[in-house]
Amino acid sequence: MNQVKMVLIFAILLFLSCVNVSAQVIKGRVTDSTTNEALSYAAVEIRSFEDDVYIGGSSTNEKGEFEFHLKGRYPKIRITVSFLGYKTIQKVYAPATEYSYLKFEMQEDSQTLNEVVVKGLSPAEKVQRLAYNVSLVETAKLKSTTMDLSNVIDKISGVKIRSTGGVGSEANVTLNGFSGRHVKIFIDGVPMDGMSSAFGLNNIPVGLAKRVEVYKGVVPIELGGDALGGAINIVTDNSRCTRVNASYSFGSFNTHKTNVYAEHTTKKGFYVSLNAYQNYSDNDYKVNIDSYTKFNEDGSNQEVKENLTVRRFHAKYHNEVAILKIGIVDKTFADRLLLGFMGGYEYKQTQNASTMDWVYGARYTTANTLMPQLTYEKRFKVLKGLHVSLNGNYNFGKSYSADTASCNYNWLGQSQPKGVPGELSYMKYRYRDHNGAANFRMALFPADGQSVSLSSTLTTFSRSGKDETAYKPTYEHPSQSMKIVTGLSYKYDYKGKWNTSAFVKHYMNHLEAYLDPEGGINYQDFSNTTSYWGGGWASTYFWGRHTQLRLSYEYALRLPTSRELFGSGDDIERGNSNLKPESSNNVNISVTANAVDLTDHRLTIDAAFQYREIKDYIRRTTNNDSGRASSQNDGRVRNLGTDLSIRYTFKDAFFVGGNFSYIDMRSLTRYVTGTQQESKNYKERVPAIPYMSVSYTHLRAHE
């Protein structure tokens, strides 16, 4: 392993030494076209010409001068200069050298003297002006860090990420009371369902993303998944420039993390990018236990109740991932046409079951990922501004779960022989988890301020395999599922002052498996297809220059995931093919207030309220006799929540913010199923859900 690390570090250094990326410097001066006097504090904004990506914004100094240092190279840029009482100027410029000096002569415009001049919006600001309750983080200042996406998302108000262990463990996202599979994760609008933990939020480096969008509650149809409790969309970085970022870190428990990102776009529109990262850790940190199994010399054992601090001894994890994309941009037939390939390997030792009462010392799993990808985008200048996009991938992955030890382990790292092999269940299970996802979107703009959008998302899952230790019919017969979620929406925007969207969604779920529908051993081919309708609306109103109000409602559904239906594959989590979809009435109210343009200071306050009432809530349970987990429908649940976020920025050089969230999630199932006996959980809080959180964030320019 040490040799592999040294080779990897050497390869990174060699790669960086062979790449020369120069920054472009853009300087300029803004003057009055009549008097030639300098115009101080004029707003200057730079965007890439090809994809309208926001690059930077500033204002002129007392001499009317501005200066930008562009990170990377851009074939063409669009510069916009605006100033109160003058006509806005836009120039498209192709920097021919590393240094450019531009002059802007502005003409007076008496019609704008009494109007408000609004600067061009960055992509982040455009998303935040939507009618949906959305929080957004841009990652430009974090590219060269070793942070992962979970570190970034965890700082957003109303969001809490809890990990089940160290490096490689599952990241459980809690969003306004909803957690786990109730919160959908997307990459460029494509669901991440079925991907291994190598592509989990706590393993993906922040450099992979351009920004992260967190939708709290109602989710737009463009994210065509069955999200009930909200959604997180990771927007990858596909800007047209040449750059390289690399990072390496090491830490406690022999933890090593490496990330390399490089991309290049030629003048003829050929694009190539490579993102490679690895994570390794022994994960041998200490944990607190209140009991353990004592092994006696005569072969007997006994449960000892004692509070101890012990070190984990079987939790090693490592993964290696490479993502290559090649294609063309800015052609007559495609704005972007990219073919991608994602390859990865993962090794994970299993220290304990779903609870810490069951300890393992030899179980492990491996997973290989081979995933081709396709991206296509085109904005048509005719046909009423038609915009079409397609994103898809398919994973030809293979996994292996091994449980062969003929002994039991305790938290002291001691072992005791047993008569039969298998710590939980004897297995050498080789299986194929093939999952695919595709998202098609089309938008049409028939008139100013109006748009019609269509989105359809397909996700498929297929598992088949063989256990080398014994014939198990449910393993060798394929288990398959297919979901199609289609949405249609209409949006109306009234002069940028008020906009509203109405949408309808259709959900289809098809399931095939070899099982006993009653949970016994009378196996048979089982097939079931269901379909449902949902819909809602979202509206936002801008009150004055600095206040935005949002109100939205949705009748939403969440279809059971492949893991909830078929299990995890390693026998730690059992499937339940009888699960029914969850349905919910969602209401969201939020307000955003900005105190801006106060010299060099900016203060932003976000406050939101959410109401959910869920039917057939899917809850994860654990069997105390085996440590296995499974899912079941649990009647009705009501959730009330609120969150508050306050952020202060000084000159774009210093940022500090605080977040507070509170939720009240309670069971409304009055009677025990099939009886008239009142449930002891009626109107009680749903267990294992954090109901209050407080966090803060600060960032200085050099960070």
Model-derived segments and their meaning:
Residues 31-35, 42-47, 80-87, 98-141:
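Short, acidic, small-residue-rich periplasmic hinge/interaction motif at the N-terminus
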Residues 67-69, 190-216:
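Short acidic/polar hinge/loop motifs at secondary-structure boundaries
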Residues 134, 150-191:
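Extracytoplasmic beta-strand/coil segments of soluble accessory domains associated
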Residues 249, 266-356:
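Periplasmic-side early beta-strands and strand-to-turn transitions of outer-membrane beta-barrels
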Residues 542, 550-554, 582-640:
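Membrane-embedded beta-barrel scaffold of Gram-negative outer-membrane proteins
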